[in-house]
């Protein structure tokens, strides 16, 4: 069974039996549940729902079912075609729609797909709203329209350009400095929608580029998660020389990673750190990232006189906390940049434009820019448990044990995070399988891994 239901939507592998995978019957059920929620929540007077998708092989099939179901529920559909996640988010806001559905499984392999659900602001649903949709779907408590009240279908392919124009209009995007820098970059678009929109953005910025895996056919050339072990091709290309940097995105272009001019990874955790440093140097203020993200953002924020706040993991949790503390920038350590001057969503186009602006103004190499930030390393481990294990009870014991130590700050808004003076470890339970994910950070990878292993042993001893 691969069908995973969450507050942000549903995802699963294509094919199989109803209830077990992402198949036509479940796509209809959850689309109808979402449409029912939108209608009865009365958050918008619009009768239009935006639909956009990445270039996955299954995307055309899923899109047809989603659009037909929405029309059957009486909603007008605005299909913006092949589009990034942030483009679709912006399209909801620009068109004053009632909501939006993004068809993408983000960094998951090619045989996966998903429905991601947006509110009228083009932002992901809150936990309470998401649970309402799941409850409606579970009860199949929806009613389709009669023949006289079916929705209409419209296509609009202009939102890619409108997205680019909105990025170029941001005050901190220094188009002149970027153009004068004469950057030459390599781009890995992982055979998805980045191959459509990133060339247009780079041309508008006056950047010379070489596309790798640029054909948006959904047949991903490698594992689509933008991590070093998956990026041998572009790292090798840049290592040959002649490039100022490499740009890597995931299939729906909400995650962003950079590669230094020498072919080495800039570090996905440092995408947000570097962009935040640039933004804070021009507009001092507060920042937010999730509990599993690098401490380097806190250090950079405090250096600029701001206050850093951690949120629970998940984009909607980050954006909610950003609004609470009036953060000028935030995001997630997986390469997700959220810049409220644009919109409250992870956006690789915004990240690219701000990063290039910073690099152009500083006049340095990417590796030199990376060296200006605090050096931390994150280790990732997991604890496999039995289905009968009371994970919450274990996490409570960890909290109690370390809460007695004066030099440890304990945070329990999302699992348990233990902040030591010079390192941290975060334990989170999975919502879909009996495991605890263990993230740890320190000044060396060896120390980070040792800390994670130590907490793993603590958990084993508690069983």
Question: Language-model segments: what does each one mean?
Answer:
Residues 1-73, 152-185:
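An N-terminal, well-structured beta->alpha segment
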Residues 13, 113-239:
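Gly/Ser/Thr-enriched, mixed-charge loops and adjacent short helices
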Residues 36, 48-112, 200-259:
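N-terminal small/polar loop signature for handling phosphorylated ligands or for N-terminal nucleophile
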Residues 52-53, 187-189, 260, 341, ...:
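Short glycine-centered, acidic/aromatic-flanked micro-motifs in structured strand/loop junctions
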Residues 71, 131-165, 169, 260-333, ...:
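Proline/glycine-rich low-complexity loops and linkers
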Residues 117-120, 257-261, 338-340:
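Short beta-strand-to-turn element immediately C-terminal to the catalytic PLP-Schiff-base lysine
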Residues 245, 283-463:
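Phosphate-binding and adjacent anionic-ligand microenvironments
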């Amino acid at each position: 069974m691969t069908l995973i239901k969450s507050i942000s939507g549903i995802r699963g592998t294509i094919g199989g039996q109803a209830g077990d995978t992402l198949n036509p019957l479940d796509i209809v059920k959850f689309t109808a549940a979402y449409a029912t929620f939108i209608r009865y929540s009365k958050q918008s007077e619009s009768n239009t729902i935006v639909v956009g998708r990445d270039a996955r092989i299954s995307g055309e099939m899923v899109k047809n079912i989603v659009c037909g179901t929405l029309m059957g529920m009486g909603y007008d559909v605005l299909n913006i075609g092949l589009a990034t996640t942030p483009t679709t988010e912006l399209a909801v806001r620009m068109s004053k729609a009632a909501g939006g559905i993004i068809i993408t499984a983000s960094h998951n392999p090619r045989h996966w797909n998903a429905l991601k659900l947006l509110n009228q602001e083009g932002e992901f649903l809150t936990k309470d709203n998401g649970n309402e949709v799941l409850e409606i779907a579970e009860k199949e408590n929806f009613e389709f329209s009669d023949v006289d009240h079916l929705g209409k279908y419209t296509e609009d392919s202009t939102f890619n350009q409108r997205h680019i124009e909105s990025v170029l209009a941001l005050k901190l995007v220094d188009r002149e400095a970027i153009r004068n820098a004469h950057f030459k970059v390599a781009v890995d678009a992982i055979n998805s929608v980045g191959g459509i929109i990133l060339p247009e953005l780079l041309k508008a910025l006056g950047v010379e580029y070489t596309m790798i895996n640029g054909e948006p056919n959904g047949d991903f050339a490698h594992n689509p998660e933008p991590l070093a072990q998956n990026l041998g091709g572009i790292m090798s290309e840049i290592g040959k020389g002649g490039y100022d940097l490499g740009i890597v995105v995931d299939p729906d272009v909400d995650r962003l990673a950079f590669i230094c001019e020498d072919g080495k990874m800039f570090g996905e955790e440092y995408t947000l750190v570097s962009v935040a440093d640039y933004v804070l140097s021009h507009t001092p203020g507060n920042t937010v990232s999730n509990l599993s993200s690098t401490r380097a953002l806190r250090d950079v924020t405090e250096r600029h006189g701001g206050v850093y706040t951690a949120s629970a993991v998940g984009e909607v949790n980050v954006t909610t906390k950003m609004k609470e503390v009036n953060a000028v920038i935030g995001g997630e350590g997986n390469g997700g940049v959220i810049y409220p001057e644009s919109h409250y969503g992870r956006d690789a186009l915004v990240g690219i434009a701000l990063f290039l602006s910073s690099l152009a103004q500083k006049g340095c190499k990417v590796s030199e820019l990376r060296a200006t930030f605090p050096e931390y390393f994150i280790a990732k481990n997991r604890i496999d448990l039995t289905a009968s294990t009371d994970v919450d009870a274990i996490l409570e014991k960890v909290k109690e044990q370390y809460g007695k130590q004066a030099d440890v700050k304990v945070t329990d808004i999302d699992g348990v995070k233990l902040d030591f003076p010079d390192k941290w470890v975060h334990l989170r339970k999975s919502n879909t399988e009996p495991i605890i994910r263990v993230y740890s950070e320190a000044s060396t990878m060896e120390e980070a891994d040792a800390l994670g292993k130590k907490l793993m042993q603590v958990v084993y001893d508690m069983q």
